Structures are given as C-alpha cells and as structure tokens.
Amino acid sequence: MGHNSDKLYVTHSEHAAGSHTASSFGKRQETGKSEFQRLPFDCCALSLQPFKNPVAVISETKAGEAPRADVFDLLNIVPYIRKFKSNPVTGKPLETSQLIKLNFSRNAEGNLHDPITYKVFSPHIHIVFLKNTGNVFDMASLQLLAIKPKTWRDLVNDEPFKRKDIITIQDPENLAARDLREYDYVKKDLKVSEDELAGDPLRGINVDAAGGASKVLKMIAEKNKSGQSPAPTPSKIDDGKGQEKKEGVVAKRKVEQMAYNASNYSSGRAAASLTSTSLMPETKSERAMFDEEEYMFEELSRPTKDKERQKSKAYATITTNFGPLNVELHGDRAPKTVYNFVQLAKAGKYDNVVFHRLIPGFMVQGGDPTGTGRGGESYWGEPFRDEHGEKGAYKHDSRGVLSMANSGPRTNGSQFFFTFRPTPHLDGKHTVFGKLVGGEETLDKIERVNVRPGGDRPVRDIVIQGVTVLQDPFEAYQARLQARLARQDQSDAALKRRAEAQKEREKDRTTWLGTKLGEKGAVGKRRMEEDVGVGKYLKVGGEAGQRTTLDVVDYGVEKKKKKAGGFGDFSGW
C-alpha cells in the first residue's frame, strides 16, 4: 500500500521535535525548528517570571500597525542594558531613560485587572497602556469610555492623551509579537552572569522601600547624568557608630482645605453615573458648590441682631439737579437688589439719567438710561428675582421708601422709585431695598414739579447727576473673606510667610540686651491671680514707721449676734 512504515500513534521523537505528522516529509520540514512558545502577559520578557516592578520598552512597528511594547521587570532589564546596551527583544540600541513605568491594578486575589471595569486580564484580552501616564487598561474599556465619547482623558487621573499614546502590551490577534523564538537574546543566547549581577548598583535595592520603580528610574537617570552609581537604600537600620546623630524633623501634615462655599451635600454625580448609562462614570463623591454671589447674599442676610445687621447696610448719596438724596440700602433684607444698585452706581450707569415718571402724592420713578421707562438692564444683563417675600422684608409704610420698579414677577432691572406716602398696596409686588435718611427737602422740591397734561412725565427734567456709594458692605465682606482664606491657606508660600511673620514678632519681643520679654498681659494676669489668692484676707498695713491707731473698746453689754446662714467664707476673719 506504500504506507506500511507509518505508525498509528505519535512517537516520542516526534513529540520532542515539535512535529504533528507521522510522515517523513513532515519530519524533515520541522527539523531544526523549536515549538511556538507564547510569553504570558504578566511575565517579564527577560526572566520569563512574573514581574514585580513592571516597566515597558516601546518597540518599532511597521507602518500602519499600532505601536506595541514589551514588559520587563526593572531589576532584570537594567543590568542587561548596562551590559549589552540593546533591547533584549529586538536587539536595537536601548537606554535606561527609555523605560516607562507601568501602573497595573490588582484585585484582592492578586490578579491583574482593568482599573475601571475590574475585569481580570487573561490571554484573550487586548491590554494597552497610555504612554504619558503609564496606566494599564483593557482596550475595550478605553474605547467605550474615552475614545467613543471623544473625551480623550485618562480614566484614572483624567489626564488628556492622544491616539499615539495608546501602546499595546498584548493583542490576542497578533500572537507572533510575543513569540519567544523571535527574541534577540534567545537567538544569540545573551545572558547576564551572576558575578555581573552581584556588582550591579541595583543589587540589594529594595524597590518598594525606595519609593517604587519610578524612584529607581529617577536614580538611574541621575546616575547617567553624573556618571556615578545610585546609592543603595539600606534594608536595615544602621547602628550609628562613627556617624553624627541627626535629629528627625516631623513635617506637619497639610490639612486639605474645603472650599468656603461648599455645601453639606454631594453633587450627586457619582450616584447619577451609577444609575444612568448616558453619563460618564464618576468614582469620587464631590460636594456641591454654592454660587459665590448667592453665598455672599446669604451671609449678609444671616445676622439677626441690630448691631450686626448694621454691617450689612449700604449708604449712598444720589445727587440731582434739585439737591442730594441720602439713602440707606437694606443689604440685610434685600442683598441681591442692593448689590445690583451699588454695582450699577459704581459703574456710572445712573449718571445723567432722568426721573422719567412723576405722580405727585404717589411716587417718582427713574433709573432708565433711555429715559423712556422701557429700558434699563440689571448688573447681570438679565432680569433677576424679587426679594419682597423674604423673611423680615421691608414694606412700603412711609414716605421716602426706595423700591424696585418692574413689569411683573422676576423682571427687576435698573429702574427704581421713591414713594411720597405709604403705599401698602405695593407690598408683595415690589422689592423695598432702601429708604431716605437725608434730603427730605429735595424730595419735596421734586414732588412739586409740574407734569405734562394727560401724562406723568415732568415738565422740567429731574436729572441724576451721579451716585456716590459711601459704605459698601459687599467690599467689606470680600475683604473679610480674603483675610479668612489667607489664614486658612496651607500652601508652602503661605506657611513660609507665617513663619517669617512669627520670627519678626519674636524679634520685637527681644530687647537689645538679648532678654526676652514675657507674654503680653502676663503682669496683669499675675496680679489677678494674686488678688484671688489667700492674701486677699490679709489687711495691708500702713507705711513703715507709722503706728496703727487702736479703736476705743466699748465694754458695754455684748449684743447677741445673729447667726448667718450657710458656711460663708473667711472674709470675716
């Protein structure tokens, strides 16, 4: 039959040669070739053992192919580079400065996994890392959460990256890239002897104690620049013999400062991203932030005592062609409205603006730069809310009340009016934000101006020549806030400034003879302590050399003393 030499089983020699055919032709084809061996993704490409301090070396690829890298253990690749100056896989020239530290994530069992989806890595997963951060991901996670949404940010530290920064470690569709038979050091049988390893500067370094692979890479880079070997980190405590003892300095731990306008509840983004697939995943809960202006308004309207509320008041002078109008602005009850008026006044928006509407016995209205009654914008460029419904809001209960003009709810702009009498029907419709405290005669003159027949426009122009802000509670608040933030600042520059200021104060408490003065108020404090001591029961005698005059003793009948209730003290002794 011509096949009587073929056996019905695979012989040992065929197994040893890596042949899977029983024919002599197949045997001859496989002669001289070793079996395909794939490097596991979690092993060093040089020692073939699981890595502890992984670093990557980017390999050159053909045009159109995705960039890829080989992974080594730091303590294995550095001695090899020092001896052969080449890449163990490709044989191309290589320096230690080209090593990239990788940040793998491990679960409780010690298995490598994706840091976002927690999917355990396997030989069938496309594993990549970002060149600029070194963080390792599953390519599917990176594609779904960073590339497809076009955010192009690292999923761990939010650093931006580009497509060229994505480097492949393992591609299941490209097995040849991890074939051990094609590695340069395998073909040429290149090794680092034990004697050379013993003399290597990294021998004996505890990488974890030195701060990880990044710290060792930094030490190597410094060595390459200076030409000196990095000093190994001692693994045991020195006995200190022959060395000068050094005092340890414990650095103060910086306290993470919370933003002054942070709320006591979270923004809800983490919960929303967990329950909604349309949102980007959020792994950190953050506090919601109050708007800075709204927070300022809340702080100014918080005081309840009259003395504290006076700090929230603003004062201004409205100069007209009829005379001045001095007003008090209620920043404690209508802070947003007062802030709008103060900022417009400081910006000169009311300069040369007329009071366009006058109704004797009712009110006079102005604040419209167009002079028509249909214009005027707020400080923010859009209408803002009313404040007549706030707790403790002022009412239209007297002459000279300063209130906001509007065309309906939440339509406040720049126009305002003064009342000529109590107008309670305007309560709940217009926000009262001030009152007249000086210049009543000016208001009387304005009220006596005639109006055009059939209308309410004054015959004679009533012009606002300017508004001068005499007291601004918002500036005072900002100054207090900046001072508080400066005291709470934990930056290096702030701490240095405080230390220098403390040193200057210490100098002021030292005389030119070198003696240090006591603490301020220490003498008075000591006297107070002496006054409340036992010595208060001792009567102080007269001056030295003077006799004390004895009182005349009355030998009459001794009066019965009433018993005092309670134990009392020793003052009667």
Swiss-Prot record:
It comes from the Eukaryota. One of its GO terms (cellular component) is catalytic step 2 spliceosome. It catalyses: [protein]-peptidylproline (omega=180) = [protein]-peptidylproline (omega=0); S-ubiquitinyl-[E2 ubiquitin-conjugating enzyme]-L-cysteine + [acceptor protein]-L-lysine = [E2 ubiquitin-conjugating enzyme]-L-cysteine + N(6)-ubiquitinyl-[acceptor protein]-L-lysine. Keywords: Isomerase, Nucleus, Rotamase, Transferase, Ubl conjugation pathway. Pfam families: Pro_isomerase. One of its GO terms (molecular function) is peptidyl-prolyl cis-trans isomerase activity. Pathway: Protein modification; protein ubiquitination. It is found in: Nucleus. The keyword Ribonucleoprotein does not apply. One of its GO terms (biological process) is protein ubiquitination. Residues 223-247, 489-515 are annotated as: Disordered. The keyword Transferase applies. Residues 37-119 form the U-box domain. Its main location: nucleus. Residues 236-247, 489-510 have a biased composition (Basic and acidic residues). Residues 312-469 form the PPIase cyclophilin-type domain. Its EC number is 2.3.2.27, 5.2.1.8. Disulfide bonds: none annotated. May catalyze the cis-trans isomerization of proline imidic peptide bonds in oligopeptides thereby assisting the folding of proteins. May also function as a chaperone, playing a role in intracellular transport of proteins. May also have a protein ubiquitin ligase activity acting as an E3 ubiquitin protein ligase or as a ubiquitin-ubiquitin ligase promoting elongation of ubiquitin chains on proteins. Belongs to the cyclophilin-type PPIase family. PPIL2 subfamily. This is Peptidyl-prolyl cis-trans isomerase-like 2. It comes from Cryptococcus neoformans var. neoformans serotype D (strain JEC21 / ATCC MYA-565) (Filobasidiella neoformans).
